[in-house]
Curated annotation (Swiss-Prot):
It comes from the Bacteria. GO terms for molecular function: acetaldehyde dehydrogenase (acetylating) activity; NAD binding. It catalyses: acetaldehyde + NAD(+) + CoA = acetyl-CoA + NADH + H(+). It is an enzyme of class 1 (oxidoreductase). The gene is lapF. Pfam families: AcetDehyd-dimer (PF09290). This is Acetaldehyde dehydrogenase 1. NAD(+) binds at residues 11-14, 161-169, 272. Gene3D superfamilies: Dihydrodipicolinate Reductase, domain 2, NAD(P)-binding Rossmann-like Domain. GO terms for biological process: catabolic process. The active site is at residue 130.
Length: 304
């Protein structure tokens, strides 16, 4: 079966984990890995896995985009450089999946709103953050049953799984995730908190989600909605698991989740990597399926 060729930008934890996810895909093929440090482990790993590599940043990739037929790029660098990366690749007709908190494109959580982005042929979609991918489906599961006045999420991440790029973007991580809890999750007000836990051995990613409903919660319908949504996320992140809840206290709905990874690049505790890379891969797959079926055609920036 024909596959859509992909480039990965950023050779850190997220970019390297992405190689494994995309390699398993029936419709995506990783062809290029872009970094800035010739000695980075991610670039070495990419070469071992048969990818072409450059340590000259996106500019090192641009001359090869057309000859190698690259149609989708994943940006796992930093919010500070994403806009420029996206502009350069969009001009060549490459669709960008943004795994930084730059959020210059629409925010995407696959089980909530992926279909509408594919239908609109967006040339840049933003994957928010690992915490956003782990918690916004739950907030949305509550808000689709009844109004949510306030939603707060707390993500606890193993320090070893949080690389320099994510650390440099922690403020953007907070703003983008808080905003997405409102825009995608459907809460009137959203708040996101991240805790980087240095414990050894590293602890699995844990997420706490609190929702305050506008009226007394319809417990049966909310519980059913949450369990259905968890099933949707588990289709692409099998390690996504309900630990406790939903529990109800007045108008407060509390849900406790954990996310185990597949152990592709980092061990299984790094579920935060997996939920991000799996969501990005799922997003790319939907676009790829539509391209292969001839339903959509990516547009170059000049036409857009």
């Amino acid at each position: 079966m024909k596959k859509i060729k992909c480039a990965l930008i950023g050779s850190g934890n997220i970019g390297t984990d992405l190689i494994y996810k995309i390699k398993r895909s029936p419709v995506l093929e990783p062809v290029w890995m872009v970094g800035i440090d010739p000695a980075s482990e991610g670039l070495a790993r990419a070469r071992e896995l048969g990818l072409k590599t450059t340590a000259d940043g996106v500019d090192g990739l641009l001359p090869h985009v057309l000859e190698d037929g690259i149609q989708i790029a994943f940006d796992a660098t930093s919010a500070y450089v994403h806009a420029e990366n996206s502009r350069k690749l969009n001009e060549l007709g490459v669709m960008m999946i943004d795994l930084t908190p730059a959020a210059i494109g629409p925010l995407c959580v696959p089980p909530v709103n992926l279909r509408q982005h594919a239908d609109r042929v967006e040339m840049n979609v933003n994957m928010i953050s690992c915490a956003g991918q782990a918690t916004i489906p739950i907030v949305n599961a509550v808000s689709r049953v009844q109004g949510v006045e306030y939603a707060e999420i707390v993500a606890s991440l193993a320090s070893k799984s949080v690389g320099p790029g994510t650390r440099a973007n922690l403020d953007e991580f907070t703003y983008t995730t808080s905003s997405a809890i409102e825009k995608v999750g459907g809460a009137k007000k959203g708040k996101a908190l991240a805790i980087i836990n240095p414990a050894e051995p590293p602890l699995i990613m844990r997420n706490t989600i609190y929702c305050l409903t506008e009226s007394a919660p319809d417990q049966a319908r909310i519980t059913e909605s949450i369990l259905q949504m968890i099933g949707e996320v588990q289709k692409y992140v099998p390690g996504y698991r309900l630990v406790n809840g939903p529990s109800y206290d007045g108008n407060k709905v509390s849900v406790f989740m954990e996310v185990a990874g597949l152990g592709d690049y980092l061990p299984k505790y790094a579920g935060n990597l997996d939920i991000m890379t799996a969501a990005a891969t799922r997003t790319a797959e939907m676009f790829a399926e539509e391209i292969l079926a001839g339903k959509i055609k990516l547009k170059t920036a000049e036409v857009a």
